[in-house]
Amino acid sequence: MTNSSIFYVFYGLIQGITEFIPISSSGHLNILEILFKNLESRNYLYETSAHFASLLALLLYLFTNKHFSKSNIKAYWKILIYATVPAIILGLILKIYDVSYINLELIGYTTIAGAILLYVSDKAKKIKLKIKKKSTKFILAGFFQCLAFLPGFSRAGSCIIAFRLFGESRKNSSIYSLYMGIPIICLSFFSNIKEFENFIVDKNLTLIFITTFFAAYFTITVFIKVINKIGFTPFVIYRILLGLILLIYLS
């Protein structure tokens, strides 16, 4: 297997494993690209393929595990649209002004900051916010989700932090973060759909799609099954260690 193939296998595995748990897929992928010195030749076709595979894995999980029903779809689709508006607005602003801030030092700090907020939201019972309406919770979580524009913070993590602050269980917070991932991943996919014009399926594209799909489905299944038992502390510890390693490496 060539170095190029190894890179894309790792890319798919990292995307699939990290997309739906609170450790940041973008942060890990940026680290991978920097380590492989591949930022210059970034291929948005492969990135879009990975997002599509993640989306398919997520939808398959939700449908096969009966998280989606006619009543659920009817209850949530409008809420999810409203909850996604803050991310759409901020994303457009960043795109218009071509704001880019990929660097390992920032990823180190945001990884640690996200870990602290995740720990506080999970453990501090006294600061739980009493919000009864589920629609309000989702819309407020949409603002938290904007933290994910900081590389290393984690989209799933920002949503879980919000729902834990709103008093939801670990499992429900994690499932709601999956729901909120649907429109975001769809937007990410369709924003780069032009990359598929006149594309040719090659080995690397296939590697990314397959590894992302199976890694994502497996990770979601295990994560939702065990999260009430293990809690978020293992993710907090991992994030702090990763952040410290990055900052020490750069010092």
Predicted segment positions?
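Multi-pass membrane proteins that catalyze or facilitate reactions on polyprenyl-/lipid-phosphate substrates
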Residues: 1-251
